[in-house]
Amino acid sequence: MNYDKFVLLFSIATLCVLFSLMFMGGYVSSSGVGLSCPDWPLCPHGLVPSTEFLIEYTHRTIAASTGLLVLLSTVFVLRSKNSVRSTRLFSIIAAAAVVGQIALGATVITEKLHAVLVTAHLGLGLILYSSLIFVVINTYYTNLKPKPYSLSSAAGTSSSGKKKSPAGYSSNKSTNL
């Protein structure tokens, strides 16, 4: 597998994990369990919480995984020789957004789910998600989408005007049809 394909597949996987995080965050928010784990970053009773904290703790665990995946995606995009400027830019925006989400998520908990902060957390999450969608689409279209054939290749001639054999090799013989 070439590096660009790896970057694309890794970015798609990151996008899927991010979607599950946003889904879980919506559930945490709407079910009212956002403060069931009032400490940050851990819950009471140590690293592995009791079942009453499980939903919120699952959201935090997925968030930590997502943060790592987004940062790794950014590193992979920046290391790719074929990434265009806009892909790199949106990858950096995604990395900055994930760092902002971590800080904002902690603030949401310490400020006891203040409505403005919860809304900002959702808004920044949408920016993060949109940025990653752009990275995935742009990586595909700039690096991996098959290039269209030129008229000369469709006509069976090479760029030098020589007739191609069925195997695609140019022939030195001039044939009159």
Each language-model region and where it sits:
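Polytopic transmembrane helical bundles with strong interfacial aromatic enrichment
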Residues: M1-L177
